[in-house]
Amino acid sequence: MKNIQKILPLYFVAGTQDCRHLGENLSENLLFVLKQALEGGITCFQFRDKGKFSLEHTPSAQKALAMSCRDLCREYGVPFIVDDNVDLALEIEADGIHVGQSDMPVQEIRAKTDKPLIIGWSVNRLDEAKIGENLAEIDYFGIGPIFPTQSKENPKPTLGMAFIQTLRNVGITKPLVAIGGVKLAHVKTLREFGADGVAVITAITHADNVQAATKALREASDEYAK
């Protein structure tokens, strides 16, 4: 059985759209940030490349970038997850896939491969968590958005940090990673409330010093585990 908790302490999510402020070469921007984040100590990376500022409409370039990100993650022994795109995840042999409530059902994903694919599931409501708790195909929940976020178009209602505590109090036992506007100052409380880790985008991609910011986030998350 996979030890999912070990990969969740600092879960980095990004695509080319999150690094466009760094210049015109979208692929190089993301690879630069990812390498610095890996040096800083991320424990997992989710390739989430979507939206009008991404490579979504140039599939060949997007696939090539995904493979480069995958290879970089493997150099550091960090799991590489693909967001939503199940076919891409399977084709390039990603370590996992993360899907939302309206994406391919997790039972179908699990049936597509006999490899030990990590499957994450986005949760925004208590009833969703209760349903997912009983689905053996799901390895962890992505809970959010915790705070307002600019990283998603039309984000769902914010939940607040106490929602993590609520999930634990009602008996949700699956590993949880909190996402959505999470910053360094929030990490300790989210971990205390029962999150197995935090997922961040701009806290890393927009940091003045990516490696240092990543290191601080990792240390804050690890501090709770001591």
Swiss-Prot record:
Gene Ontology CC terms: cytoplasm
Question: CDD domains in the record, alphabetically?
Answer: TMP_TenI
Query: Does the keyword section mention Magnesium?
Result: yes
> EC number(s)?
2.5.1.3
Say which domain of life the source belongs to. Bacteria
Pfam family name, one: TMP-TENI
Identify the residues that bind 2-[(2R,5Z)-2-carboxy-4-methylthiazol-5(2H)-ylidene]ethyl phosphate. T149, Q150, S151, G181, I201, T202
Task: Say which enzyme class the record assigns.
Answer: transferase
Q: What does this protein do?
A: Condenses 4-methyl-5-(beta-hydroxyethyl)thiazole monophosphate (THZ-P) and 2-methyl-4-amino-5-hydroxymethyl pyrimidine pyrophosphate (HMP-PP) to form thiamine monophosphate (TMP).
- Spell out the protein name for this chain: Thiamine-phosphate synthase
Q: Which gene encodes it?
A: thiE
